[in-house]
């Protein structure tokens, strides 16, 4: 189900003109849709960044404008937090029609130095700065995390991901 929904959303993004290295913002409450978005964006060859919906609107606006985001993927109850953004198309994740697209794996080729995701620093020395991470960097991080993920399978150690904010990598 996860893969089919991610594939369908990725085809929607591709048909909407998303290309490798485009940046798409994800603003969701912690949910299954957050994971669908991350995977779909990567499958479309684009890069994602998560914005915590509890952030103040000015901070969110700064992130979205600074990153030159083309799309914001969000949920119905959060649309008021992104309605002020010019040149930004919202895709409401609560509408099931977005999962009616082709659910096969898209045929997109990415390069090792293409963007995969973006995070922002805390801004402790001024304005937060965007840090762009590449496909090869993501692959290396996942490879390095495999032993940790194996360890976390034991008992209730697997809950670590549920206590971090989604913008945290």
PLM segments and residue spans:
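Catalytic "switch" loops of ABC-type ATPases
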Residues: 163
């Amino acid at each position: 189900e996860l893969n089919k929904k991610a594939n369908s959303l990725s085809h929607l993004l591709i048909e909407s003109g998303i290309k490798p290295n485009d940046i798409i913002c994800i603003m969701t409450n912690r949910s299954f849709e957050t994971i669908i978005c991350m995977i779909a964006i990567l499958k479309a060859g684009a890069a994602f960044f998560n914005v915590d919906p509890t952030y103040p609107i000015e901070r969110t606006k700064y992130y979205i404008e600074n990153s030159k985001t083309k799309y914001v993927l969000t949920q119905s109850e959060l649309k008021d937090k992104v309605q002020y953004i010019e040149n930004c198309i919202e895709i409401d994740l609560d509408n099931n029609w977005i999962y009616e697209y082709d659910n096969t794996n898209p045929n997109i080729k990415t390069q090792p130095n293409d963007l995969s995701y973006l995070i922002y620093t805390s801004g402790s020395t001024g304005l937060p700065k965007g840090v762009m991470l590449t496909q090869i960097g993501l692959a290396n991080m996942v490879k390095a995390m495999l032993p940790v993920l194996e360890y976390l399978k034991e008992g209730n150690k697997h809950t670590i991901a549920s206590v971090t904010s989604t913008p945290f990598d």
